[in-house]
Amino acid sequence: MEVAANCSLRVKRPLLDPRFEGYKLSLEPLPCYQLELDAAVAEVKLRDDQYTLEHMHAFGMYNYLHCDSWYQDSVYYIDTLGRIMNLTVMLDTALGKPREVFRLPTDLTACDNRLCASIHFSSSTWVTLSDGTGRLYVIGTGERGNSASEKWEIMFNEELGDPFIIIHSISLLNAEEHSIATLLLRIEKEELDMKGSGFYVSLEWVTISKKNQDNKKYEIIKRDILRGKSVPHYAAIEPDGNGLMIVSYKSLTFVQAGQDLEENMDEDISEKIKEPLYYWQQTEDDLTVTIRLPEDSTKEDIQIQFLPDHINIVLKDHQFLEGKLYSSIDHESSTWIIKESNSLEISLIKKNEGLTWPELVIGDKQGELIRDSAQCAAIAERLMHLTSEELNPNPDKEKPPCNAQELEECDIFFEESSSLCRFDGNTLKTTHVVNLGSNQYLFSVIVDPKEMPCFCLRHDVDALLWQPHSSKQDDMWEHIATFNALGYVQASKRDKKFFACAPNYSYAALCECLRRVFIYRQPAPMSTVLYNRKEGRQVGQVAKQQVASLETNDPILGFQATNERLFVLTTKNLFLIKVNTEN
């Protein structure tokens, strides 16, 4: 069995600035333009049954504004009329109204459990689109932005099950066929999950293809599914379609894929076996066994036989648990009851009071013993002489090396540790793994549309931008830019909603849920002489911070950055902030 290579991200030292002195607040005005929308943005709020943190990450914080990275300063959104609206900026002072480029053929409001409609630009002439009801569209657009050749035409249209959003897609063209590969994200209910949230994350990799020599329609040729317990921070298909890269807090694994299906089913079965069949706890006098019952169970479905050193439990004519008990019980005083939480509670009275049972039924490993805090403390006290001869062998342990009260919230490391994984598209096995440790994921950005999206991670106080290169097996992730101290600065923005940067790295920006936008520029040469009095030296460069406050009380729904402009979307308006004047 092949083991995935354990890799690390190599930081380029020349891109770091250890002498960075921070951002200087600039009061220079930022030109801001406002466009009123003909129809409101098709926002879909979370339902009552979408209550988990993963629902919030995937759908509650969804970016409703989409940037076409193949064409400069071109953004799209979907309104309540089912129209895909486009705004392409040529001149800030002569802004036109957003124009309709396509209209969804289905009524968005007809589906009760729909998600937000999503769109992804696979290439300069292809688009993937989801209406939020579970239907996937592949659309040929012609050359977007060219009125003579642009025409949005549905080339593939199929229902793919439960509603999903599109995470990423690519277009693959060779002499024999044209393919579109796309990633679809769902959060689905898991009935067997008793202890977790009751949901799991599903990431489906779908490939749609058409042979060039045939006149056949586009059809699905491959569907693979990954499952996990957390929404991926980042997921993208490699440009050649041979692999997949994912950044996530909890790992995702393939569960349905041709030759590996049987193997994965065996893994799933073994996982289910590991789940405790019952839970039990004990005191000095008795034992309590708790069993989760199937739905609609009644007293008539339960048969329990107590013997002095034996127990037999039958549920709905099926043997549930049978065997010799670890020690004797008072079988005449033992009882059972059905609780309101649809669970069966069995009370066993010990014959030998004070005896601690290490197991309930001899040789049975299907149950889990739950210890209370008093028992744990008593056991620890009895074992103390085995671990230390002194009550306090390390008296300095209580004296931390620094005063925790002096630490700011953004100094504290995150408990969660994400990982970056690369999956092979043919074997569906993990080939490379990077443990990101405390390198917090911040955002992703498309620098070159022909390459995979970049992702930005916090490294100490800085924010480092990484470009994946699937063709370089030994050095898959390149450090291409650094935003000085931005990892530290963003941590203090507790109301931040979206994070972005310019494709040319000239600035990074984040917005809060309401109104305010913060812009952090890269250090630039000074036009005047400035001295650092403490060090008695001339300062050559200064990094500026600017703040824009939008004239609206509506929450921000979308946020995109280009080299020259920031686009901010609310329910009724689209704002343009001119950040850079240089072309």
UniProtKB/Swiss-Prot annotation:
Residues 273-361 form the CS domain. InterPro entries: CS_dom, HSP20-like_chaperone, NUDCD1. The modification Phosphoserine is found at residues 8, 388. PROSITE patterns: CS. Keywords: Cytoplasm, Immunity, Nucleus, Phosphoprotein, Tumor antigen. Coiled coil: none annotated. Isoform 1 is specifically expressed in leukemias and a variety of solid tumor cell lines and is also detected in testis and heart. Isoform 2 is predominantly expressed in testis and weakly expressed in tumor cells. The keyword Transcription does not apply. The keyword Phosphoprotein applies. It holds the Pfam family CS. One of its GO terms (biological process) is immune system process. GO terms for cellular component: cytosol; nucleoplasm. Isoform 1 is the dominant immunogenic isoform and is capable of eliciting a humoral response in individuals with a variety of solid tumors. Expression of isoform 1 in a wide variety of malignancies as well as the presence of an immunogenic epitope suggest that it may be a suitable target for antigen-specific immunotherapy. This is NudC domain-containing protein 1. It comes from Homo sapiens. The lineage of its organism: Eukaryota, Metazoa, Chordata, Craniata, Vertebrata.
